[in-house]
Amino acid sequence: YFPTGAGDIFKANEVLTEYRSGDRKLAAFVDQKAGDIPIGRRSYEVHSYKPAYIAPSRLLTLDELTKRGFGEALYPGMDEAQRAARLLADDMNDMENRIARREEWMAAETMIGNGCVMQEYIDGATKGDSLVVKFYDGTSDHTYTASKKWNENGGDFWGDVKAMCRMLSARGLPAKDLILGTDVADYILTDERTRQLLDKNSGIIVGEIRQQLTQYDGVVFMGTLNFGGFMLNVFSVDETYEDETGKSARYFPATAAMVTAPDCGHMMYGSITQMDYGKTDYTTYAAKRVAKLVVDQDKDTRKLRLGCRPLAAPKTLSLIHISEPTRRTP
């Protein structure tokens, strides 16, 4: 949902985000004698943001270098240089995975809340400033509220999702995917009306549910359902991460549902300026990731840092509608 294009990596401290509404206007009928009628370009908004800085690092000491590494044979026959190279690759992989999880969190928060709050840290425990990014003025209109919970009497899962699709369609925006939290997904599998509509003997074909794992951790493709002509790919999301308190947290709420479409946003990156190892001048890099090596020869230590300045931004105003349609199961 948030790919990075060639124009999304900036060689600047700030990035420019552009987003606009959909287009539902009609072309006018024109008298041949008039020639043509000029039309204005769709209005759009441009905002400048300074992306937050992400920079995990890992220190390699002489003591760690002489220890047997994780997964290493008991008598490996590795010398210090070989072990250091292996540790370097492992450290780089660990830091890349942590940054990728943070980017996933930013994308999820932006889809859910039309923005996100990025809490800076001075060190591993001390909080710094909170950076707030909002892609709307005043109040956001991206939320749809179900009149009744779907798993309570009077709930209308099919009607509410169709209404969400029509809200997007009325603005000239696509509706392709239905993303569900685990509680909502479990409810749909037990919903009697859904079972009846999926019965091929009924003569009304509304889709098929055939669950299968996807290439993404914690994401299940449930099938395709037809909501008043809107054919939606249905996904269940159960992916979690470890938050700052050490507790497990969900990227997507268990009781939430969202109608959206691929390519609804993009991941942008600001530049990073640093003094590289062995250099005396500063260099500015426009890249997704920027590595830096710091060597302290006096203490026989080496530190590897992986820097990143990402910003998840929507491409279209009010593209995403999210609801909390089910009561949490005990």
Predicted features along the sequence, with ranges:
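Basic/polar low-complexity intrinsically disordered segments
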Residues: T4-A27, A249-R250, K292-L293, K299-R305, ...
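Short conserved micro-motifs at the rims of enzyme active sites and ligand-binding pockets
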Residues: A28-V30, T190-D191, Y269-I272, P314-S318
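Long, contiguous amphipathic alpha-helices that act as assembly "spine/axial" helices in icosahedral shell
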Residues: I54-D137, D156, D160-V161, C165-D186, ...
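Contiguous, function-dense segments enriched for cysteine-driven chemistry
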Residues: G128-M167, E192-R195, K200, R210-N233, ...
